[in-house]
């Protein structure tokens, strides 16, 4: 006998209907555990889990390949960065198990504490942070370096999700409700720009705006804030000579291929060498220290060179499906009025996809370089740990949503 779960009433949120439409349109492509709304036998999203493992595996393989030349030069060990990345993966796995055991109510309760802790760490890094290429973004703990900016992303999105639960009506009906999150962004932006780290500021700003849109904020508020945001970004670019060089290099990197346009031209050469099937794993020429940051910010170019167009498309599809699953999980959580979980899941999907878009766009010459990692693929301990934690939060949200539906069915069948 086929059992069915009762349909639960959707919250009426402006912007939520768009999320439902996108999710429904793509639902046949990626269905997670292939369950329908009438079945809740499998209590976790298998597709999301395997996509996460796949991206982490691709990341480890490509970090190993791309980092061998620089590892040999810096430490006389070609596998130095691969070993560290392996340690980060083990730590991420341990952290993932812990995250899966924590109910979402825990993150909601301590969201403000997490944000306060992130602000304190951002202050500490300005005082005792280790500097790399003129940017003080890391706190050196010996075996591990912490990048507070990565923790700030997750803690802010938890805080904003909780804020939207508490002040949703104020956000929709009052300008003050809309501006309060912008005030938090402003405080974080000041601390981040002091490092400097414009890329993280852009991610925080865009993701927060998207969350407010889903919560039903008025359109004219977005137009005003976006206009102010664009003006602020332009002023910040003009204030720093290195940012001006990045933008001009993005417009025409071949004008100065050995100066400001060097990194981008080398990245484009990597894509050109890759063609359809690539040069083969380990056969990149650009990673031989022609392309700076080949194992971090520009690892996507090495994927293009070694695995070709096919590898690039595969990686992008996997990233897209992870982002879609996040939005779908968020939609289902909002359907049963798990608002904190729903908003947080949507924010993770937007964050994941936007950061990947900026990284890929910078490597392909479509966007100025921002120093953002490719989620789960680029080398970077803090990024890997925080991103994997965010993915495990999605799995926990999905589990709680399915559990709620199953319990609703049991109650309804009595």
Swiss-Prot record:
Its EC number is 2.4.99.28. The keyword Lipoprotein does not apply. The chain crosses the membrane at residues 13-33, 48-68, 87-107, 112-132, 175-194, 198-217, 222-244, 302-322, 343-363, 374-394. Residues 1-12, 69-86, 133-174, 218-221, 323-342, 395-414 are cytoplasmic. Its main location: membrane. It is an enzyme of class 2 (transferase). GO terms for molecular function: lipid-linked peptidoglycan transporter activity; peptidoglycan glycosyltransferase activity. Changing residue 311 to D: Thermosensitive. Fails to localize to the division site at 42 degrees Celsius. One of its GO terms (cellular component) is divisome complex. It catalyses: [GlcNAc-(1->4)-Mur2Ac(oyl-L-Ala-gamma-D-Glu-L-Lys-D-Ala-D-Ala)](n)-di-trans,octa-cis-undecaprenyl diphosphate + beta-D-GlcNAc-(1->4)-Mur2Ac(oyl-L-Ala-gamma-D-Glu-L-Lys-D-Ala-D-Ala)-di-trans,octa-cis-undecaprenyl diphosphate = [GlcNAc-(1->4)-Mur2Ac(oyl-L-Ala-gamma-D-Glu-L-Lys-D-Ala-D-Ala)](n+1)-di-trans,octa-cis-undecaprenyl diphosphate + di-trans,octa-cis-undecaprenyl diphosphate + H(+). The keyword Membrane applies. Changing residue 172 to S: Does not affect localization, but affects its thermosensitivity. Disulfide bonds: none annotated. It comes from the Bacteria. GO terms for biological process: cell division; cell wall organization; division septum assembly; FtsZ-dependent cytokinesis; peptidoglycan biosynthetic process; regulation of cell shape. Residues 34-47, 108-111, 195-197, 245-301, 364-373 are periplasmic. It is a multi-pass membrane protein. It holds the Pfam family FTSW_RODA_SPOVE. Changing residue 368 to A: Cannot recruit FtsI at the division site. Forms a complex with FtsI. Also interacts with FtsL, FtsQ and FtsN. Belongs to the SEDS family. FtsW subfamily. The periplasmic loop between transmembrane domains 7 and 8 is essential for activity and the loop between transmembrane domains 9 and 10 is involved in the recruitment of FtsI at the division site. This is Probable peptidoglycan glycosyltransferase FtsW. It comes from Escherichia coli (strain K12). The gene is ftsW.
